């Protein structure tokens, strides 16, 4: 029997600059969305937007033991929260429905039948133990992997295996020559002949593997650019060979262009694990990252707008993003830098927008109810501008302004605030109370003038120490939003009540 060759792709149709860009994001619904996964989605989405192309969102859910609907819903929630939208895919539909692999099994069976008929795939009956035994008998390392033994079984051998009740896996026949492709990020890459054995595409129970369904879906959906993590680089020669075969049998129209994005490293120069708390997208959201800040930072994990420009908008990202500019070197996830960039984007928010984004965090801290009262609305409107310039994460807001929402008798004084109090605390508080009691116009300027006169001028306390006891009495903290403005929000009666309560 003459087996077909898929080694020569020189004359195969290729993606050109004129080919409309079609990229995809195709996660498995396992676990919680993590930084590396979202960076991949972001780069695909940005490239589609930059080129006026199409972003396809499909789900690879052929592993029933690991996949879950909860993870699927989390993927949808993650992309929607970040504002990463898709033209085709789950929930949206499109010309290549369905977009969940578990609903496309009949399509894969048809393709497998064509691959078998054309000789690009074959049945393999060897068990792992038999493969190892053959390696040992030949003096080879038993862990070398599959030895291509079943490539050309006779009809009699196949019949004998079937008589034993064996169910075959299906393997793709790898060419006996180098496999070379050009990576958008890494340039030309070659895998030497013989370095990759014939590989399984269908399990013995008939269920398809990622090695089959991923390139088949790319072919059927007309994907032009495969942009994914570096961890999948080693699987690319297998996919190149399979796509060549798919072109030969009329399933694929062209070979997509591959681009492998750099690893994201965590602490200690180790690859950032999806189980690392810093990698968990929803934990980052819970801490108070906003989409604008997080997208900006994730863009920097392998790409940059310019050498001296770390802060940019999503619109600027779309305008300038090109996969060819992505660096091959590993990118390090620096949580401190991420927080700083997030803080810059918080300061860029419109005041009303910022105020509205604080509400879920205040609600989570039980400072406000499901519906804000008129007084809570008033406090938030006046307090938000005091902290917008001072926080890097929305999650820092509740602790910073919680004292404004509490009853006067519910202020807990932090330990570090107590430690800095002067020995003549009672005297200082009495002077402050007397000075404030006399203030008729309850404004920040009047409050500051009265306290400065009583504590700095009259008592001789250094300015940087003078107002600490008042701050602690009013807020319970050593550090708070601007003191005098906070006292205006509380009102005269509440401010004095807190000073009296703290004095005891």
From Swiss-Prot:
Arranged from A to Z, the UniProt key words for this protein are: Aminoacyl-tRNA synthetase, ATP-binding, Cytoplasm, Ligase, Nucleotide-binding, Protein biosynthesis
Motif 'HIGH' region per record, residues: 27-37
Record-listed ATP binding positions: 274
- GO BP term, pick one: glutamyl-tRNA aminoacylation
UniProt key word tRNA-binding: no
Per the Swiss-Prot or TrEMBL record, what residue ranges does the short sequence motif 'KMSKS' region cover?
271-275
What cellular component terms from Gene Ontology apply here? cytosol
Name the enzyme group at the top EC level: ligase
A Pfam family assignment: Anticodon_2
Protein role: Catalyzes the attachment of glutamate to tRNA(Glu) in a two-step reaction: glutamate is first activated by ATP to form Glu-AMP and then transferred to the acceptor end of tRNA(Glu).
What family does the Swiss-Prot or TrEMBL record give for this protein?
Belongs to the class-I aminoacyl-tRNA synthetase family. Glutamate--tRNA ligase type 1 subfamily.
Q: How does it assemble?
A: Monomer.
Descriptive protein name: Glutamate--tRNA ligase
List the source organism. Answer: Arthrobacter sp. (strain FB24)
């Amino acid at each position: 029997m003459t087996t077909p060759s898929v080694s020569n792709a020189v004359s195969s149709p290729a993606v050109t600059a004129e080919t409309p860009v079609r990229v995809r994001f195709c996660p498995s619904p396992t676990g919680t969305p993590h930084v590396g996964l979202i960076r991949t989605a972001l780069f695909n989405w940005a490239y589609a937007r930059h080129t006026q192309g199409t972003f396809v969102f499909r789900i690879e859910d052929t592993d029933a033991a690991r996949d879950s609907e909860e993870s699927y819903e989390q993927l949808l929630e993650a992309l929607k929260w970040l504002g990463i939208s898709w033209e085709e895919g789950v929930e949206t539909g499109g010309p290549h429905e369905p977009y969940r692999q578990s609903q496309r099994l009949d399509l894969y069976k048809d393709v497998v039948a064509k691959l078998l008929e054309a000789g690009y795939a074959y049945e393999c009956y060897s068990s792992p133990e038999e493969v190892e035994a053959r390696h040992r008998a030949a003096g080879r390392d038993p862990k070398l992997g599959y030895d291509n033994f079943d490539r050309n079984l006779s009809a009699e051998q196949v019949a004998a295996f079937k008589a034993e009740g064996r169910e075959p896996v299906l393997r793709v026949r790898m060419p006996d020559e180098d496999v070379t492709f050009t990576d958008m990020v890494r340039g030309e890459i070659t895998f030497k002949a013989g370095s990759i054995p014939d590989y399984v595409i269908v399990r013995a129970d008939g269920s398809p593997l990622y090695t089959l369904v991923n390139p088949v879906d790319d072919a059927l959906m007309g994907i032009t650019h495969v942009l994914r993590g570096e961890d999948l680089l080693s699987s690319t020669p297998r996919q190149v060979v399979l796509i060549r075969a798919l072109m030969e049998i009329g399933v694929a129209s062209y070979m997509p262009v591959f681009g492998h994005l750099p690893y994201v490293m965590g602490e200690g120069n180790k690859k950032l694990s999806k189980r690392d708390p810093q990698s968990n997208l929803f934990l980052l959201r819970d801490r108070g990252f906003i989409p604008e800040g997080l997208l900006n930072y994730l863009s920097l994990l392998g790409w940059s707008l310019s050498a001296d420009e770390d802060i940019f908008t999503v619109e600027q990202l779309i305008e300038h993003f090109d996969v060819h500019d992505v660096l091959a070197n590993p990118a390090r996830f620096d949580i401190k830098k991420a927080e700083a960039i997030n803080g810059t984007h918080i300061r860029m928010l419109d005041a009303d927008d910022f105020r509205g984004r604080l509400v879920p965090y205040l609600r989570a801290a039980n400072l406000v109810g499901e519906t804000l009262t008129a007084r809570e609305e008033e406090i938030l409107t006046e307090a938000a501008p005091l902290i917008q310039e001072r926080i890097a994460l929305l999650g820092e807001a509740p602790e910073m302004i919680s004292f404004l929402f509490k009853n006067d008798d519910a202020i807990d004084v932090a330990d570090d605030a107590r430690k800095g109090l002067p020995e003549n605390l009672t005297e200082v508080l009495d002077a402050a109370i007397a000075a404030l009691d006399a203030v008729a116009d309850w404004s920040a300027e009047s409050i500051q003038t009265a306290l400065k006169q009583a504590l700095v001028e009259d008592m001789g306390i250094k300015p940087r120490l003078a107002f600490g006891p008042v701050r602690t009495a009013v807020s319970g903290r050593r550090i708070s939003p601007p003191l005098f403005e906070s006292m205006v929000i509380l009102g005269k009666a509440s401010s004095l009540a807190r000073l009296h309560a703290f004095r005891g």
